[in-house]
Amino acid sequence: FNLCLFPSLIMSISVVITGANRGIGLGLVREILKNPQVGKVFATTRNASKATELAMISDPRMIIVQMDGESDESVKKAVEQVAEHVGSSGVDFLVNNAGVLIGVDYNKPIKREDVAANFNVNCIATMVVTQAFHGLLETAAKKNGHAQVVNISSDLGSIADSHGSTPRGFTPYSMSKAALNMFTRNVSLDWKDEGIRCTSIHPGWVQTDMGGQEASLTVEESTSNIAHTIFKLDETTNGLFYNWKFDAMRW
């Protein structure tokens, strides 16, 4: 996505980031807003009234959008709100960041609802949200030649690099991220002719509520790299899997 080749995009790039109220999502909002070529950042959160840190960002290019990915009505309203702002320009980037991690203990009976929760948010909600924004992505692709979906995945979703479960019982999370990677691959093929690309990115082990403070990366270290990586994506990276440093990952 070489912006120099598309002068019409300068100061008009629109980016939607889900799960933007904290952690990696919040960090991505801050980092992407540092790019002067970005015109609008739509930061989605389940509950806008509780997104206090997000609300403290004073940049007028950022628009907070309330969206619960598990609610069809909420997703519909969010897309309508974004559409009102972007009009005929569409959405250039959709960053599916919202996610949960609910572990299971193999030494106890497994609760089906805990396993399902990982899939509901990490897979199903992402599919629903991506499809809902398809029209706006297609609009941008028709105007500029391409649009980009970015799925924030995890190395724990890599089947090739799996080392079994962990003491924290991450298997359901790993399964959901492996499924998300399949979604990335299929979207990259199914929407290729429309100019819509899709790529998975592993953000690293990050110091968030999910990752814990013992993690090796700060939010800024991870998201500053991801923000640069996102704008490097092009037709050669469609349907592939990278880490925050833009190194290729194995499925």
What is each stretch, according to the model?
Residues 74-77, 125-132:
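Conserved mid-core alpha-helix of short-chain dehydrogenase/reductase
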Residues 21-30:
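N-terminal Rossmann NAD(P)H-binding glycine-rich loop of SDR-like oxidoreductase domains
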Residues 69-88:
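Conserved Rossmann-fold cofactor-binding substructure of NAD(P)-dependent oxidoreductases
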